[in-house]
Regions:
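Short, internal strand/loop/helix patches
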Residues: 337, 400-434, 440-441
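Conserved redox-active cysteine motifs that mediate thiol-disulfide chemistry
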Residues: 350, 358-375
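C-terminal motif of bacterial Sec signal peptides marking the signal peptidase cleavage site
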Residues: 17-20
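Structural microenvironment flanking redox-active thiols in thiol-disulfide oxidoreductases
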Residues: 368-406, 419-425
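A non-transmembrane, solvent-exposed segment enriched in polar/low-complexity residues
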Residues: 23-180, 184, 191-195, 200-202
């Protein structure tokens, strides 16, 4: 199509850069490398350096820190304070200083020392990525395929043009950094494109959806199995999204659940040892967090396939932690007040299957589920089950108002202490909405059950009612 002629040329040019530059494989001598500085307004007294290393270092009460370590690999490392990553390009032997306020440091960090030009651009690059993100994700991901592709590639053009213009004004980048930046932009675009099918279907559950046969052509020339690319921020995110995309949008056969398919796909499709270690670890971690019941089916294979001792130990620790929430275990006790002020305990619900929704009025994904939850309640109203919603709102007035104004059905409770409430701690809840199925006997059936919008929920509840 004519409107894509320029974009096609640009992508061809970027692809040439992407696949002809090999300088990231340059071998460096191990050298003492120093990263120091001051990060104010942080609540944490620990700063971590990730990349080819995993280092934790103390920060004093003023936010000052100093990391001195031996490195032999150049790349875009990540400094992490609390949950805030700060990307830093480091070459072995560098001495780099960074200052800023934790609240704005991702887009306003100040650098001094070696590779200032590259690191200043990383700050600019993160700002530009935020600026070029769509303002309305709903309308962005519900575009028709051709329009969506054009929008995404327009953003890529801006990112590529900006780094070229920056170098004209401020001098050429280090060759390794320049190559990694090209890779970063390509992987970033691929992640957005791979998100399209799942977001479109989530936002348009009533619409039929099918990708064109050529939609995934952007993956054909992308390196999916490269240890050196692990030093590029978006590569790890790309790997995980690539795995999800391949499983969801192909006819890959194999046993359910999806995590077993993912394990099989990693085993067959990846050769690099370190990449496989990371993928096995991430798939297992995701499985534990989303379905400890499924994770139990994988742990034996994981222990055989995982060659990284640190990853092996960490996953087994997670399994032990989550084992209290396995199917058949007694559901952890809770006792909270309802709208009418009466206290409802989990023991009061024995004899019926209970579908629990842990939510909050400020949680947008929670609110998206409400129409589906209402439909589910209506469809199953003649069954022997209870729909229980537990809010972790800090604002009880907002909670009461929403439940009454929306005429929400079922039993509604409010958990005291929001994220520090017992139900959050006992059920290992890190994000909401979280759905839980408890059997008539008070034992767990699924501690991380499908959402009401899921195609799986009706069959799972039907099975629970029949047990």
């Amino acid at each position: 199509m004519p409107k894509y002629t320029y974009l096609a040329f640009l992508l061809l040019f970027v692809s040439f850069l992407f696949f002809s530059c090999k300088e990231q494989h340059k071998i460096y001598r191990q050298a003492t490398t120093i990263i120091e500085g001051q990060i104010t307004s942080a609540n944490s007294n620990i700063i971590s350096l990730y990349g080819d290393v995993d280092i934790k270092s103390p920060m004093n009460q003023d936010g000052k820190f100093r990391i001195s370590t031996e490195l032999n690999k150049a790349g875009i490392y990540s400094l992490l304070v609390e949950t805030q990553p700060i990307y830093v390009f480091i070459v072995p032997g560098d001495k780099i200083s960074i200052t800023g306020d934790i609240r704005t440091i991702a887009t306003e960090a100040k650098f001094d020392g070696d590779h200032v030009n590259e690191n200043n651009y990383l700050v600019r690059f993160e700002s530009l990525k935020l600026e070029t993100q769509p303002e309305n994700l709903d309308s962005f991901f519900t575009q028709q395929e051709d329009d969506f592709i054009a929008t995404v590639e327009s953003r890529t053009t801006k990112l590529n043009t900006d780094q070229q213009e920056y170098q004209k004004k401020n001098g050429l980048f280090d060759g390794v950094f320049a190559d990694m930046l090209v890779h970063e932009i390509v992987y970033d675009e691929a992640v957005v494109k791979m998100n399209y099918p799942s977001y479109f279907k989530y936002l348009n559950p009533e619409k039929s959806f099918k990708l064109s046969d050529t939609y995934d052509s952007f993956l054909q020339n992308i390196d999916t199995d490269s240890e050196s690319n692990l030093m590029i921020p978006s590569y790890k995110k790309f790997l995980l999204m690539y795995l999800e995309f391949k499983i969801q949008n192909s006819s890959i056969s194999g046993a359910n659940p999806a995590y077993i398919k993912k394990f099989n796909f990693v085993q067959k499709s990846f050769q690099n040892k370190k990449v496989k270690e990371i993928l096995f670890y991430e798939v297992m971690k995701q499985s534990i967090n989303e379905s400890i019941n499924d994770a139990e089916l994988l742990i034996s294979d994981y222990n055989k396939l995982q060659t990284n001792e640190v990853y092996l130990a960490e996953i087994n620790d997670m399994i032990n932690k989550w084992s209290i929430l396995l199917k058949g275990k007694k559901a952890p006790h809770f006792s909270y007040k309802a709208l009418n002020g009466k206290t409802v305990r989990i023991e009061d619900l024995l004899g019926k299957v209970v579908y629990i929704d842990v939510w909050a009025t400020w949680c947008v994904p929670c609110l998206r589920e409400l129409p589906f939850l209402e439909k589910l309640q209506e469809d199953l109203k003649n069954n022997d089950m209870t729909f229980l919603s537990i809010s972790i709102d800090n604002d009880q007035v907002a909670w009461r108002s929403m439940v009454k104004n929306k005429k929400m059905k079922g039993i509604h409770l409010i958990a005291e202490n929001d994220w520090k409430s017992n139900i959050v701690a006992d059920y290992l809840i890190t994000d909401i909405p979280r759905f839980i199925i408890i059997g008539r006997d008070g034992n767990i059936i699924n501690s991380n059950a499908p959402r009401p919008s899921s195609e799986k929920i009706r069959s799972e509840l039907t099975e629970a009612l029949g047990s």
